[in-house]
Regions:
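Transmembrane alpha-helical segments of polytopic membrane transport and secretion proteins
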Residues: 1-21, 240-253
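Transmembrane-helix boundary motif in ABC transporter permease subunits
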Residues: 72-101
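C-terminal transmembrane helix and the adjacent membrane-cytosol boundary/short C-terminal tail
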Residues: 91, 148, 183, 225-253
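Periplasmic/extracellular loop-to-transmembrane helix junction in inner-membrane transport proteins
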Residues: 33-74
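Short helix-to-coil transition segments within interhelical loops
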Residues: 147-153, 157-177, 217
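Generic hydrophobic transmembrane alpha-helix motif, especially the helices
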Residues: 102-138, 145-146
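Transmembrane alpha-helices
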Residues: 129, 133, 166-198, 226, ...
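Glycine-rich helix-loop "coupling/hinge" segments at transmembrane-helix boundaries
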Residues: 118, 194-231, 250-253
Length: 253
C-alpha cells in the first residue's frame, strides 16, 4: 500500500513537471524560430546564462531582499500573535479593532509603500514595514478566527473543571487554533517576498526589486526574468518551510 501511495504521488508530481518542461521547450523554440530580440523576450538558455555570469550580483541583492523579508515576517508574526491574544482575552478590544482592521485591508498595500519611503527613507526599514503590513492581517485574522471557533463542548468541559481563562487558553484554545494560524502564515509567506520586491521598486538602493528596475531600464530582460525566478523560488521555499513547521508542531501538540 505504501509503495502504491508513493507511485501515485510521483505520478501526480510528474504531470506539472512535464508541463513545465514542455512550456520551456516551446518558449525556446518560438523565440529562436521567430528570431525575437533578447530585449523583448529572452530564451530560457539566455536566462540560465545570465544567472551564472551575474551570479554574485544576484546573490548579493537576494540576501538584501531575504533580510527585509524575514525581519518583516517576524515583526508581523510577533505583533499579530500578541494582538490576537489580547483580543481573545479582552472582548471590548476585539469589538473595537476587528472592524477597523477589516476596513484597513481595502487600502492597497502598494499605495502605502511611497509613504513609508518618505517617512523612513530609502534604507531597509520601509521595506521591512511593507512586508510586515502584508503579512500581519492574514496571520491575525486566521489566529483570531481559530481562537473563536473552538468546539463549545470542549469549552464547557474546561468550565466544568473550573479552569482559569489562562489555563483554557494554553491547554485548549492555543493548540486548537494552530491549524488556522498556519493557514494565515502560509498566505502571508506566499506574498511577503513580492511585497519586499515591490517596496524596493518604489525606492531603494539594494535588493531584487532594485536589480529588476535597473535591468529593465537597460532592456536586459534576461536579468529581469532571472530575478523574477528567484522571487518565485524563494516564495516556494518559504511555503515549504511553513508546511514542514506545521507538520512538526501539529505532531507534538
Amino acid at each position: 500500500m505504501t509503495n502504491l501511495k508513493i507511485t501515485d504521488k510521483f505520478k501526480d508530481s510528474l504531470y506539472p513537471i512535464l508541463t513545465f518542461l514542455a512550456i520551456i521547450i516551446v518558449w525556446q523554440a518560438v523565440v529562436e524560430i521567430k528570431d525575437i530580440p533578447q530585449y523583448i523576450l529572452p530564451t530560457p538558455i539566455d536566462i540560465i546564462k545570465v544567472s551564472i555570469t551575474d551570479y554574485q550580483n544576484l546573490f548579493d541583492n537576494t540576501l538584501v531582499t531575504l533580510y527585509e523579508t524575514i525581519l518583516g515576517f517576524i515583526l508581523a508574526l510577533l505583533v499579530a500573535l500578541t494582538l490576537g491574544i489580547i483580543m481573545d482575552f479582552v472582548s471590548v478590544i476585539r469589538k473595537c479593532l476587528y472592524p477597523i482592521l477589516v476596513v484597513s485591508q481595502t487600502i492597497p498595500t502598494i499605495t502605502i509603500a511611497p509613504l513609508l519611503i518618505i517617512w523612513f527613507g530609502f534604507e531597509a526599514l520601509p521595506k521591512i514595514l511593507m512586508v510586515a503590513l502584508t503579512c500581519f492581517f492574514p496571520i491575525l485574522i486566521s489566529f483570531v478566527d481559530g481562537l473563536e471557533n473552538i468546539d463549545k463542548d470542549y469549552l464547557n468541559l474546561f468550565k466544568t473543571m473550573k479552569s482559569s481563562k489562562l489555563q483554557t487558553f494554553i491547554h485548549l484554545k492555543l493548540p486548537m487554533s494552530i491549524d488556522k494560524l498556519f493557514s494565515g502564515i502560509k498566505i502571508s509567506v506566499t506574498y511577503m517576498v513580492v511585497a519586499a520586491t515591490v517596496a524596493e521598486w518604489l525606492g531603494g538602493t539594494k535588493g531584487l526589486g532594485v536589480y529588476m528596475v535597473r535591468a529593465k531600464s537597460a532592456y536586459a530582460l534576461d536579468k529581469v526574468f532571472a530575478s523574477t525566478i528567484i522571487v518565485v523560488v524563494l516564495s516556494l521555499i518559504f511555503v515549504g518551510l511553513v508546511n514542514i513547521a506545521k507538520k512538526i508542531i501539529i505532531k507534538h501538540k
